[in-house]
Amino acid sequence: MYDWWVLQLAKLSVSRKLMVGFGVLLALLLLVVISSNRTLTHQTALSEQLAEVASLMEQTQQAEQGRLAFEAGSDPRQAEQVRQTLAGMLQRLQALRDSELDPAALAHQVEAIEAYRKAFDDLAAADQQRSAARGVLVGTAQQALDSFARLEELMDASLAQQAGDPQALQRSRAVADLHQQLLMVRYQVRGYVFERSDKAEQAAFAAFDALRQAATTLRGQLPGEADAALEQAMGSLQGYRGGIEQFRAGVIRTRQAQQAMQSSTQDMARAGRTLTEAGRQLRESTASRDRASLWLIAALALAFGCVAGWAINRQIVRPLDEALAQAEAIAAGDLGKRPQNPLTLQRRDELGQLQRVMQRMGDSLRELVGRISDGVSQLASSAEELSAVTEQTRAGVNSQKVETDQVATAMHEMAATVQDVARNAELASQAARQADEEARQGDAVVDQAVTRIERLASEMDVSSEAMARLKNESEQIGSVLDVIKSVAEQTNLLALNAAIEAARAGDAGRGFAVVADEVRGLAQRTQQSTAEIEGLIQRLQQGAGEAAERLENSRSLTASTVELARRAGAALDSITRTVSDIQNMNLQIATAAEQQSTVAEEINRSVLSVRDVAEQSAAASEQTAASSGELARLGTQLQAQVGRFRL
C-alpha cells in the first residue's frame, strides 16, 4: 500500500509536487488569515457593542442630568430632550438585540428604560399638576385675602359704630388675627411650594388648620354681614386648601416618579454593568476559542509542512541521490550500475525520466564500448597481420631490387657482348643462353613480386576498410558523447532549478540545495570526463584519418608498382623471346648487332625503370610498415582506454 502511494506520488511532476505542497501551505496560511480576520472582526464587533453599552450608560447619566435640570426649571424643552435621549437609548437597544450580548440583560435594560420613561412622564404630569396647583393657590389665596380684607373692613365699621364695646374690639382683633394667620398660612404655603419638604408641608397644613379653627370659633359671634363675610372667607380658605391638597398630590406623585426613576436608573446601571461584564466575558471566551483555533491551524500547518518536507525528501532527494550514484558509477567507468529501488524506473516525473535516461545511456554506452572493444581487437589483429605482410613485402621488394640490379648489370654486359658479337659468335650464343636463363629468372622474380604486391594491395584494401570502420565507430562514440554531454547539461540545469527552488523554500530546502550542488558538481565532472574522452576520440579519429590517408597512398603506390611489375614481366618476356630469336638466328647476329645493341639499351633503360619502381615500392613499404606500427600503437592505446569501462 505504501509503495502504491509512493508510485502514485511519483507520477506527479516535480513542479506539481512543489505546487501541491506549497499550495496546501498557502491554503493553511490563507485559513489562518481568514480566521484571524474573522476573530478581529468578531472582537471589533464585541468592542463596538461594549462601546455601545458604555454609550448607553453615558446616555443614562445624560437623561438623569436632564431630569434634574427639568425638575429645577420645569423647562418643556428639557423634558423633550430627555424623552429623545430615552428614545435613542431604546433604538440602540433594539439594534443590539441581534448581537451576542445577554438577551435577558438587554430585555431588562429595555424594561428599565420603559419604566424610567413612564416615571418621567409621571414626573412631567406631576410638574404640570403642581403648576396648576400653584395657579389655584395664587387665585384662592387672593380670594381669601380679599375676603378677609372685606371682613376686616366690616369689622372696622362695626367697631366704629360700637365704639367702646369691649366685645366688638375683641372680635375686631380676632378678625385681624385671622388676617395675620392667613398671611402666615400663605407664607408657609409659599415655603412649602418652594421646599416641598415634609416639614414645610406640616407647617403649612398646621398653620392652615390653626386658621380654620380660629375662623370656626368666630362663627356666629360676628354681626350678620360680617358673619356672612366670614363664611365667604372660609369658603375661600377651603378652595385654598384644595389647591394645597392638589399641590401636595403633585409633590407626592413627583416623589413617586423620582423614586421610580431612581429605581429604573439603578436597574439600567445594573443592566449596563451586566451587559458590560457579559460582553467582556464573551469577548474573552471568544478570544480564547479563536486563539485555540489559530493554534490548531498553525499546528496543522506545521505538521503538514513537516510531512511535505519529508515527502519532498522521499520523492526528490532520494531519487537524486540514486541518479548521483549512477552518474558517479558511469563517470568511474562502471556501466553495469543499476538503481537499487526498482520502483524508481516506474516514476513518471522528471526524476524518473532522468533515471530511465541514465539507464538507457548506460546500456548504450555498454553496448557501444563492447562493440568498440571488439573492433579494437580486430583492429589490433589486422594491424599485426598488416605489419607482418608489410615486412614480407618489404623483404620481397628488397629482393626485387637486388634482382633488378642484377638484371641491369646483365643487360649492361649483354650490351657489351652485343658490340663484340661480331668478333665472338660463340660467346654471343653462350651469352644468349645465359641471358635467356637470367631473363627467365627475372621473369619468375617479377611474377613473384607482382603476386606479393597484389597481396599487399589486397591487405591495403582490408586495412582501409578496417580504418573506415574504426572511423565510423569513433564517430558513433562522438555522437554518444554528445548524448552524455546533453544529459550532463540537463542534469546541471535540473540541479540548478532544484537549487533555485530550494533557495525559495528557505531553511526547509537547505538540504535539498546541498544535494543539488553535489549533482551540479557531478554533472560538471561528467562534462569534464566527456570532454577528455572526446579529446581522445578526436585524436583517435585524427590518427585513423592519417593512417587511412597513408594506406590510400600506399595502395596507390602498390597499384603503380603492380603495373610497373607487369610491364617489367612483359619486358622480360620480350627479352626471352629476343634471346630465343638470337639463339635461333645465330647466323644473323652480325647483321642484327646494331639492332640488338639498340634493343639492349632500351632493355637497360626499362630495367633501370623497374629498379626505380622497386626503390619506390621499398620506400612505400617502409612507410606502410611505419603506418602499420602507428595503427597498432593506436589500437593498443584505444584498448587501454576502453579497458577503463566495466561492462
UniProtKB/Swiss-Prot annotation:
Gene3D superfamilies given in the database record: 1.20.1440.210, Methyl-accepting chemotaxis protein
Q: Which residues lie on this side of the membrane: Periplasmic?
A: 38-291
Q: Which residues form the HAMP domain?
A: 314-370
GO BP, one annotated term? signal transduction
Q: What happens when the gene is disrupted?
A: Deletion of the gene results in a drop in the chemotactic response toward alphaKG to close to background levels, but does not alter maize root colonization.
One GO cellular component term of this record is:
plasma membrane
Report the locations given in the UniProt record.
Answer: Cell inner membrane
- What sequence ranges are listed for the domain HBM? 45-287
Q: What GO MF annotations does this protein's record show?
A: transmembrane signaling receptor activity
Describe, as the record does, how this protein assembles with itself and its partners: Ligand free ligand-binding domain (LBD) is present in a monomer-dimer equilibrium. AlphaKG binding stabilizes the homodimer.
Q: Tell me which family the UniProt entry assigns to this protein.
A: Belongs to the methyl-accepting chemotaxis (MCP) protein family.
State the protein's name. Answer: Methyl-accepting chemotaxis protein McpK
The species is Pseudomonas aeruginosa (strain ATCC 15692 / DSM 22644 / CIP 104116 / JCM 14847 / LMG 12228 / 1C / PRS 101 / PAO1)
